[in-house]
């Protein structure tokens, strides 16, 4: 059996607080993601979902346990990993073409080759004709398309996505979710997609992982046995979608309530 693309084994992550204390974001978290799998991660606010992505990417190192990507221990920034953040990560002073070409240029591509590849990806994400626009001249959905092109142009074997569509309106979000599935289907990348939206997680993923209220650990994993290719709007009306939703929500709801009670208590102190 092939090794997982991503392995987290008994991972704990602690941070120092400004007052000299210790905050534990993750505790004894174990998770595998297979090569080519689309894995969604859901959990209440503050459960360590984004921290998990940071550990996989090498932006943060585990306090205990082990993180491996493609069989190798993560000891720093991980090669072959793309990251799409919740907030726009475009350079405001660069055009769409310059933003998308920046990755290949950083990796040593000649300027002309980088621009040719950038134009190809700009077309693939539906932004042909906008190459010379600046980020402030684009809508939120268009900037997200730029972000996808920025990540995918580098051919990542692993794509990490941290609530990338959360700030978009419902209609644009649906379009972007379908766009993501279309682009992903043409690659062999493993995806770890963090979201607060359980419906989004089920519509996109092969498997949904539920994280407990912090310190986060895996509470359960659920296979999403819905056919592909999918239309994320239409798939929600299938009876099986509702069954999967109810099964996951029955576990996720308790963690959301725990997190909510903690927030109320903290606000009252």
Predicted regions and their residues:
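Short coil-to-helix segment of the ABC ATPase nucleotide-binding domain corresponding to the Q-loop/switch region
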Residues: 94-102
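Helix-to-loop junction immediately C-terminal to a conserved catalytic motif
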Residues: 57
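Conserved signature/switch motifs of ABC ATPase nucleotide-binding domains
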Residues: 133-136, 154
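Conserved ABC ATPase "signature" region
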Residues: 105, 112-130, 182
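Conserved ABC transporter NBD signature motif
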Residues: 65-77
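The feature captures the beta-strand-to-loop junction immediately N-terminal to the Walker
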Residues: 42-44
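Catalytic Walker B motif of ABC-type/P-loop ATPase nucleotide-binding domains
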Residues: 159-162
